[in-house]
A protein has these predicted regions:
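Short, acidic/small-residue loops that bind anionic groups at enzyme active sites
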Residues: 16-40, 48-54, 183-184
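Internal helical hairpin/lid segments
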Residues: 114-169
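Conserved anion/nucleotide-ligand pocket segment
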Residues: 46-108, 112
Length: 217
């Protein structure tokens, strides 16, 4: 379990012996800047990691019961589905792929590396204190990568804390989803807010916006 996020995880990526990790699999979990490690571990080893609360940032303070229960339930007994609460659906539909993503600005920083999954994927994204024009720019940069756009089958948005313009945010994803014509929705409880789910990155899943559910298969 990571202690905290912040910055600097990307500096570690070329210094890690991924064969050691692959041959000695362990639960690896965190969020925010830790996204860089999670996605590269999945890419280089095929091992599932977990978007989850962290030791100092969450368990070291006043963590809530919801986050604690989700953490231990998921890691001890597994998770079968996620209900997307209070979701805004920008484009209806059903899609499948590996659940993949995390902190948007951290993912953008990986561009130039071989980090994208080989499989079709459902992209999850969250961030904090990023103006909407930068969110627009980061998504656009990713979509300009043919491998990203071709394998992208759905988008699920988590918490984007500290937004400067909620209407622009909504308008951007409404327009984007109409252009891509893939299921796109909000409602995944992960990011930098107090309550957060624990769930696997790299697990096969089905997104059904009509049922507001992600089901792991």
């Amino acid at each position: 379990i990571a202690c905290r996020g912040g910055y600097g995880a990307i500096r570690l990526l070329d210094k890690i012996d991924y064969d050691i990790i692959k041959n000695n699999p362990k639960i690896f979990c965190g969020y925010s800047d830790i996204t860089a490690l999670e996605l590269m571990i999945y890419k280089r080893t095929g091992l599932v990691t977990y978007n989850a609360p962290m030791a100092y940032s969450d368990f070291g303070s006043d963590i809530d019961d919801f986050s604690t229960k989700s953490f231990f339930d998921t890691l001890q007994t597994g998770i079968k589905e996620i209900t997307l609460n209070s979701s805004t659906v920008f484009y209806d539909g059903i899609c499948s792929g590996v659940l993949w993503g995390g902190n948007l600005s951290t993912i953008q920083s990986l561009c130039g590396l071989d980090f994208l999954p080989e499989e079709n994927f459902i992209f999850i994204a969250e961030d904090i204190n990023e103006p909407v024009y930068k969110i627009d720019k980061m998504f656009t940069q990713l979509l300009n990568m043919p491998a990203f756009k071709n394998r992208l089958k759905g988008i699920v948005l988590g918490d984007f804390s500290g937004l400067d313009n909620e209407k622009y945010f909504q308008d951007f994803f409404k327009e984007l989803s109409q252009e891509l014509k893939i299921p796109t929705t909000t409602g995944l409880k992960f990011g930098h807010e107090k309550q957060k789910l624990t769930f696997p990155i790299g697990a096969n899943a089905v997104l059904d916006t009509n049922l507001s559910k992600i089901t792991f298969i």
